[in-house]
Amino acid sequence: MLRIAQTLEAQLRAAMQQAFPEADGELNPALGPASKPEFGDFQANGALALAKPLKQAPRQIAAAIVEQLQNNPEFSALAEAPQIAGPGFINITLKPSVLAAEVRQRIGDPRLGVAAVEQAEAPVIVDFSSPNIAKEMHVGHLRSTIIGDCLARVLEFRGHQVLRLNHVGDWGTQFGMLITHLKQVAPEALNTADAIDLGDLVAFYREAKKRFDDDEAFQTTSREEVVKLQGGDATSLKAWGLLCDQSRREFQKIYDRLDIRLNERGESFYNPQLAAVVDDLRSSGLLVTDEGAGCVFLEGVVGKEGKPLPLIVQKSDGGFNYATTDLAAIRYRLGSAGDGAGRVIYVTDAGQAAHFAGVFQVAKRAGWVPAAASLEHVPFGLVQGDDGKKLKTRAGDTVRLKDLLDEAVERAQADLRRRLEEEERQESESFIDQVATTVGLAAVKYADLSTNRITNYQFSFERMLALTGNTAPYLLYAVVRISGIARKGGALDGELPERLVFEEPQEWALIRQLLQLDAVISEVESDLLPNRLCTYLFELSQSFNRFYDQVPVLKADEPMRSSRLALCRLAADTLKLGLSLLGIPSLERM
């Protein structure tokens, strides 16, 4: 109901100006959704802020505003007579005919009343997932991948040009030590594709890391190998390319399972730009040499001794680091010679907040961030086990993402087979596989997205696969229930009656919930909190279930029957759209 809210806000502001022409400054109606259904649809609190400057009681001010509103025929066409409550709140209830007209407009509209941005603005970049080459994706990559994908989907649906970037860790010292180790223990891996699988590569990486930590001669050889790689040595580059390809194929298997679309642009892409970053910082007077390292001292960030903390961009040996690469990425992403983006969103764990705050500050001070552009860090908490600690295997290892997804599907299949047996239902193996895969992966995604991303959350297969509560299976089942109406003879896509007729409180509660979709999507677009969309879909499912359990649909007389079927259709379409923005496909049967 964003359009109606904007209209009401303009009408309220005009009424305030007419009632109090002597008021200074811009008048703010302070319009928002009503805090409780009994207070109507909207509540305006602007009278309270005017009490002090006008030296009048808030209720007296509210009464004057209401009088002007009621003199406006356009307002009277939208809403019932406003009510003044409490110290001076103005409660506004929309007319039933207005709500019914809004429902009619949304039925059959693929956007369900959600407006697209008016004109194509500068691209929006969402940087997410970002695993490291030669390492398997683990549970720590789950949140970045799922949250980033959801945000990209919402922004794309709103009409933004979105560039989904996978900033993979494909460069650095680790390749020097890995290539050096493989030359000695598995040379075939450096010149033959698929000579080893990723699991073996990970094991070799661990061995190489141990040797690097323990053996000084190995360290020296590894660093020499890095120099060769950076210098464009053909043999080293071929080995590096094979290692990257091997990891890339394994990553893609995970992305395909989760229906994630990404454009890979790894750290190596920015290598040719690193020296220019340091030169720019030096020429702008920001770069300071401290103990041999090139750094920029941060403003407003001090250490234990009260001294400004540095952001190191060039090590004392002349090498570069993550900060240099991230600065080069910002410079390219926002620059007219690069992506020309207007908004860059980084989806990483909360532990990197200080790093990004420093990098963003330096980029702004260097003049690489245009006035209209924004850099946003989207932090998230840890995935924990039932013990409240970081999720680990029983052996204490990090949980591989592949294993976690496999177990989710296996558990969903076991639950489904048990339910089929209890209900004495016969279904094909292909049906069981499809439903179990959809439910299992949806449960993992939804459990993550439904939690406020800023907080940690405890991973529990039992909770996330439950058919009750704020879970993916509960939402999917609501869609299945509506699909069942069509199977029972209720044409959900039938012609609408000439006039939609709604009488029951359960109908109006569902309608008001359905009409909030555009406002919720707008909130997610600005606040980047997917749990807001999850909460909305859960409350919508609850509202639909109350309506369907308490109000006859198929057995109702006309025009109530057609009107209620239209509500069912809009509820199904809204749930399906909302789930798709979370990256979750719907099911017709479960």
UniProtKB/Swiss-Prot annotation:
E.C. number: 6.1.1.19
Sorted UniProt keywords: Aminoacyl-tRNA synthetase, ATP-binding, Cytoplasm, Ligase, Nucleotide-binding, Protein biosynthesis
Reactions this protein catalyses: tRNA(Arg) + L-arginine + ATP = L-arginyl-tRNA(Arg) + AMP + diphosphate
GO terms, molecular function: arginine-tRNA ligase activity; ATP binding
InterPro entries linked to this entry: aa-tRNA-synth_I_CS (IPR001412), Arg-tRNA-ligase (IPR001278), Arg-tRNA-synth_N (IPR005148), Arg-tRNA-synth_N_sf (IPR036695), ArgRS_core (IPR035684), DALR_anticod-bd (IPR008909), Rossmann-like_a/b/a_fold (IPR014729), tRNAsynth_Ia_anticodon-bd (IPR009080)
Taxonomic superkingdom: Bacteria
Cellular component, GO, one term: cytoplasm
Motif range ('HIGH' region): 131-141
UniProt xrefs under PROSITE patterns: AA_TRNA_LIGASE_I
Database matches in SMART domains: Arg_tRNA_synt_N (SM01016), DALR_1 (SM00836)
UniProt cross-references to Pfam families, sorted A to Z: Arg_tRNA_synt_N (PF03485), DALR_1 (PF05746), tRNA-synt_1d (PF00750)
GO biological process: arginyl-tRNA aminoacylation
Compartments (UniProt record): Cytoplasm
Record text on subunit structure and interactions: Monomer.
Protein family according to the UniProt entry: Belongs to the class-I aminoacyl-tRNA synthetase family.
The name this protein goes by in its record: Arginine--tRNA ligase
Organism of this sequence: Synechococcus sp. (strain RCC307)
Source organism phylogeny: Bacteria, Bacillati, Cyanobacteriota, Cyanophyceae, Synechococcales
